[in-house]
Every structure is written in C-alpha cells, then in structure tokens.
C-alpha cells in the first residue's frame, strides 16, 4: 500500500471530524485521492469496486454535512461502503478487507460506531433509518437519520413499505436515492423507467422553481397555486410518486458534483419531515474500464489497475453456476415450456447465455424474491415449467411464497439454489447456512444436494421433470472436476449412492462435503455414502448402514440444527433403530468472512476435521466389527 505522502489529504482523515475541518474547496481533491486509494486497495485485496468508485463524492458530502456518528447514516446493501469505512478510521485496515479476522465487506455494528446498521441484503435501509428517526423523536433526541439506497434496491417491496410508513409518520428522515441505473445486473421494471422520466423532467422543475420565486411575493396566491400544482404535476411530468407518499422530492442532482452535493445536503438538513434527494451517479466513476463495464467490475479479484481485468483463463472445470447455466440452455432447447426467472442476479446466477438465446423466456423481476416465486407459481399453474435461479441467502426472503404459493399447491417449480452452504468473503449476510433446515420441513418439496458437477446437472433434470416443487442446492465455485455428461438424464428419486465399502464407521455425506468424506474414510477404512437426497431420504439405505456399523456420521455444509443429519436421526427413531450418531455440520453461530477453505476447516468439515471428530467419538463407541485399528492408527494430514 502506498505511503501517506501519496495521499496528503486522505492521510489526515482519521475520522469524519477531521474531514469536517477541511475547507470545502479541498473536498474535490480529497475525492480524487480517495478514489485512487480505493482502486489501489481493492485491486490488491479483491472486493466490490465499481459501486464504491461511484459513491466517493456522495460519501464525503454526507460525512461533511452530517454530524456522524450521532447523525445516523444507513447504507442499503452496503457493498458501496468502502469509502465510508476509509473515512471513519479504517483506512489502514483495508489490506485485510473480507479476509478472516479483517474488515467486513459490509457495514457491521460490531466493527465501528459509524456502522449504525448491519446490512448485506437490499432494501432494508429506509425501514432501519425510519426506526432510528422514530426512536429519536420518542426519546427527544435531536439527530438526523439518513438512508442511502440505490435505484436497484428501490424496486423491492420492502422499500415501498418503509416509504409509505415514513410519509404517514411525518418522520424526520432523509432518503438519498443513489441512481446509477445498476444493481448488479442492469435494472429493470417500471421503477427504473419512472426514474428515467424524472431525469428528463426539466420543464417541470424549471416551472415549479420559477413559480415559487414569484409567488413568494404574492402570499394570497400561494395556497391557490399549491393546490393547482398538484394538478399541474400530472400535466407536465408523470406524477411524482415520492411526493404522493408524503415525501418532499428534490433533484435529480449530479452525484459527482461535490460543491452542489454539500450545498444541497446542508439545505435539506435544515428541513423537517420526510425528504428524498435523488442523486445521479455513475458506477465505476473515475476509472474508465469500470465505467465501461460496471457489471464486470462489480465484484473483482486481484488485478493490475494499469491493465484492467485480464481475459480470464479457461478453467480446468466449470463452476457450479456455469454448470447450471449450460443445463438451463440445454433443457430450454429440449422443452419449450421452460422459463428462467431471476431476482436481479443474471450474471451471478449464470443466466447470461440463456437471456441472450431465449430472451422471450427469460424474466428478470428485479430485486423482488417474493414476487419471483409467486410469478413462477402463476406460470406453473398455466402450463409453463419455471426455473428460479436464486442464491440461498436470498431465498430466505421468499419463504412464505415457497410454502403458500408453491408447495401447498404442489406446483412444478424448480429452485436452482446457488451459493449454498459456506460462501466465504461476503460473511454472514451472504452465507447459505440454513437452506437444508428450512427446506426439508416443507411438504411436497423434493430437496437435493449434488456432490459434483455432473450430479448437479442430473439433479436439475430430475427436479425439472417432477410434477411438484423441487430444490437443488449447490455451493459457490468449482466442484471436484467430474466429467459432464451432455445428456439430460435423471436420477432415481430418493436413492443414495454407496461410494466406498468399509467397516465400523459409515459416513453419510450430503452434497459438496463428499470429497472430504472420501479422503477421511481412507485412514478410518470407513464406508461412505453419497446421500444425494435430503428429502425424500433413502431410509432403507440408512437402516442398512445403521445395522452394519458401529457409528453413523452425517456430514453437511448446513447448520446441524434441523439439517440433513436431523433427518437421519428422525428416520432412525421412527424405525426404532438405536445406533451411535455423530452430526458434523456448521455450528450454531453465524459464519464470519474468510475464504471458503478457512471456514470449512474451522467448522471441522475438511478431511482432517472429519477424521479428528470421528476418532474422538469412537473412543466412546463399543466395537461390533473389529475396527480397533482405526483408533490406533496415527493421525496423518490429508491433502485438501
């Protein structure tokens, strides 16, 4: 990282109070240094880049005008909060960004008093800031609450619920709408079109402001014209939605014009009630490659800023996301009923090629997970075969729709659940720790977890051809490199696969933990079963394993509570079988950020951790099968 002399202004900012000591004339130069530091830092560590480059001036202006942390800034989603972290005393910690034990990639209350609300998912900021504004009013405290939300996040229903409540409460709340025409994928829908129309509403703005200046000198006319203005709005521009919700709307203004931002925010700080400031920014601003390709530079690994993101090497094996994307195109060619649905995650979920080849069958519904599942249910009612591509963590937002709109009606909707289990650097807000637990209890739902890429493809075909709802959950990144069969073959529903015959110990592996189970099985001489289906469970094979082994060990990259291991225990209890059990999975705590490998090792789900846990448990288990040698064998390191 460069020395302080490379950033003479930025190096003087240890907190926002230092920032507020600067003359306003120096703020543009500070913005240049902050943007350069961001590029140097994120290109070294990886992380979210384009969104942060786009919020440099806005972040400086907010901390310059408002008395943070007494005044509350609430960032929506939070991936654009790196400038905020840098200006609030965490500049020197940036080399540890998103690494185990280092800075979180999102605002985190435990990390800094300036992080007033923990975020990671979209569209929560207005609700949280409103809650803070209402708390201040009830407690008699004189402070401001500011929500900073993107135009993509504004498409979600929760944002409108909060706007509706805030307008009704006449709360002292400022909402800053950061309009960069992007979330992760390009924004879609009526809200995006509405904001575009506002941007072109220059005539209305000119007439309105000019009239106010004149009418200020004619008090008897002011009230008449106020009422007339409400009718004029609809004649000059589309109705100002935010004002109808009880907000005073200001803008749009240039989000990269620091003097204008500071002046406007100072004026708005002095006004009471609900206010909405519409600022227009450019994702990737100040770094040409990111401006030209904001999607590509949304989340980056390490790269050379002078070269930009190099064309990626062809991987030795595809990621699970790529396997899904190819399967979707293949199945779409085979079955014209297939439709693909995503809640604003076209790139992340692997739907780019599908959207290009089958545009009439591709539906990006915006950041609207609840709507995504219910619109899929409606399609399924009338003969289509919907496939919803969604991250595990975001599926949590649509749990009621899964039960009420899909499962109760037993509709043939396939959920392709990406980023299941341990995810890594994005931390607890993006971990897929809970899906097996909350899915397997839903009646009518078939739940599958592939152990490799080819099995993922076969499970997707299996779920697609079922007459009811199905879910296939797969992890982030690449699998073990299994050869892919180009066909669209299915698997027998509810049948596990015996992968290794051993004695004494049976390892029942669900999904991506299978390679680690196979590695741990060698020194144990353990039996290994690839369980494949969490629901319906292969109860016959579970019974066979229980009757022929001293210890059953369940393995899953899901929380132990209520997960696949619990399904095995429940099955044995129903069958009246008593056998020693060991459940290995994610512990009863939220995953912190770190690499996937580090987090799996910490949870004891790598080969070494499995081996150690099994050996410790065997000390308390009597032998029925002569497996004493696995206890006395020296522990050895198993390569990952």
Swiss-Prot record:
Thiamine diphosphate binds at residues 79, 120-122, 152-153, 180, 287, 369. It catalyses: D-glyceraldehyde 3-phosphate + pyruvate + H(+) = 1-deoxy-D-xylulose 5-phosphate + CO2. Its EC number is 2.2.1.7. The keyword Isomerase does not apply. One of its GO terms (molecular function) is magnesium ion binding. Its cofactor is Mg(2+); thiamine diphosphate. Keywords: Isoprene biosynthesis, Magnesium, Metal-binding, Thiamine biosynthesis, Thiamine pyrophosphate, Transferase. This is 1-deoxy-D-xylulose-5-phosphate synthase. The lineage of its organism: Bacteria, Pseudomonadati, Pseudomonadota, Gammaproteobacteria, Chromatiales.
